Amino acid sequence: MLVVLIVAQSLDGFIARHDEPGVAWASSADQRWFRQALGEFDCQVMASTTYQTVRDHLRSKSEDGCFRIVMTRRPQNFAADQETGALEFTSASPAAILRTLTDSDRTACALLGGATAHDAFLRSGLVNEIWVTIEPRIFGRGTPLVRETQDQKLAIISSERLPNSDSLLVRYRVIK
């Protein structure tokens, strides 16, 4: 299973501005690129705060064939949103989540955040690539890309300036 962590971050490494969840602050160029990039994946994993930020949008896409799993300590709190095989909630480990996806014949997973999900998958050694859009903004505080101490080596795959913007997309391979 290919697992790609996809994220937009400020130049100083924050994925959410101050105490505001979500990436509404990201450039329109990144938002266009992100929507297109998601088409390369047949499944998505995110933490519950990320889910709550995009809940209404995701629930309207439940029939698009993408299997979405939301990591939460309390899956029962989301029972009303559960759609088996399309949108599921779990407190399982990252390895167990990937087994569920693999058993459902999924091959490419977009890891969408937030920092809790990033930490769990990186700590487990399950991330193959990281695609980060570096936005030309400095926040000074907010939600970091990761919260736990990490020492993960990466190798650059590519970098490109997103069209009509000052945003930089960098793709890395995780060295295992």
PLM regions and their residue ranges:
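Enzymes that bind and transform nitrogen-containing heteroaromatic metabolites
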Residues: M1-K176
